[in-house]
Amino acid sequence: MATGLRCDGAARQRERGLIVKSDIEAVVRSADLAGWKPVEVEYGTRSFPVLVPGDSRILEMNEVAPLRDPGARMRAALNAPIGSRTLPVILLSKGKPASELTVCITTSDITRPVPYKGDSGILPPLLALLHGAGIRRENVTLIVGTGTHRPSSPAEKVTMFGEDVVAHYRIVDHSCDDAAALVDIGRTASGTEIWINRTFYEADVKIATALVESHFMAGASGGRKAVCPALVSRKTIERFHSAQFLDSPLATNLVLEGNPCHEEALEIAKRCGVDFIVNTVLNRRLQLLEVFAGDLVLAHAKAVELLRSVVAVPLDEEYDVVLTHGGYVGINHYQIAKAAVNALPVVRPGGTIILAACERDDDPIGPLTYRTLLHLLKLQGPRGYMSALLNPGWVFTKDQWEPQMWAKVLDKVGEEGLVYCSAVLSPKEHLIVPGRAGWDYLPADAPEDEMTRARTMLQNAIVYAVKNPRRRGAVPRVAFIKEGPYAVPVRTPAAVRHEAQLISG
């Protein structure tokens, strides 16, 4: 049974609402949790238990065994590509001796755990295959596809690729702002100017490598995303991340068909002439599940098919209260948006999302531009923020897309419907963060230990959301997304049809 809440002073109580705060105190003091069951909630690299109602739905991903011999599977995938000729045959089709061909391999940066080095890595068998077909080492260039990210450090290159590759191959970082390193190859059907990395575009053989995971804007990573946004100009990236594209309901997890972000990136990747891709799918322990090599479209589609079978969680109804967490990837508020967006299919309109956050980054919220835009969202609300972004006079601002994702969350549950439980952010920092602060749920004698404090605020938030007297005796339906940002709840066709009938009837 929870204890009384802290009093932060009259001004603080007026700001957050004295009546609501008193409600919280009364509810957590008197809550009877008989019949509730424990669930383990991830908190950064650790976890802790909290209690949820005994009939709560646990939403979890499928467990898929990793490959027993990932190195052998990597070699087999390269030698039997999907929808494509083998690399040696592709080299023969280029019209000049293999010893004269230039090869460019685009890679992810340090923010993505792509298996590049070692016995189970992409690069050793890929490079061996190229050299065995006559490609000279000095004619191979690795381009780190940074998008708008910073260049990779020498130490990061060793971490990603291994000392041998770093010592013997040319490795460069893409720069989205270096005009001399970009080439204009026209416009997309939607009018986007395509400025692409010159080294990649002018190479005789273009190979794109990546990890395929769910992406809450482009549907899935990998495939075409190794070119756009990874190897294009800032101006092209701004279009890819534009408010107009992201405003589409199809710009979401695991959706490719009709997704404007996916279609734009795919058109750009096709235009620049990708010859071959190597994509991987990992489990949450970063173990290799499968390798997909070959055609830009077909091999990537197979990877997404496997990904969907692993991360998609069938959902037949919406819930009043949804508990989730930021996971290991949630190093700051910017990254934790993934977990909140993944909860959207689960929560009913006007429901409650309770989010456990463990920000471990030096800047627990995010960069200055993100903070500024987040504050704008806080002041104007989701509709006001979107109106600003969609206004013809709006000047594209870096990071504007992430508050747009938070706006989608607030548009469904409201400011009070998002409970952001962070023991890292101070109450002052919470003033610019959307939602209700977990600090409002702490008892007066809250422990100083961060882990215990986080667990206490989360438990009290759950108790209040379930036992809130405003429910007038109604028993709320509760769901827990066990894997947080990694799981992708997907409405079943029956659920979608039922919802459509309710709306029309």
Regions found by a protein language model. Give the residues of each.
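N-terminal active-site beta-alpha-beta segment that forms phosphate/nucleotide-binding
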Residues: 87-150, 323, 336, 340-354, ...
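An N-terminal, well-structured beta->alpha segment
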Residues: 52-93
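Short helix/loop capping segments that flank catalytic or ligand/cofactor-binding pockets
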Residues: 50, 60, 114-115, 208-209, ...
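Extended hydrophobic packing segments that form well-structured cores
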Residues: 17-60, 71, 416-505
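Conserved, well-structured core segments that form the ligand-binding/active-site neighborhood
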Residues: 166-318, 346
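C-terminal catalytic subdomain
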Residues: 333-420, 426
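Active-site segments that bind and position negatively charged phosphate/pyrophosphate groups
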Residues: 297-363
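Well-ordered mid-protein domain cores that form the structural environment of catalytic cofactors
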Residues: 119-192
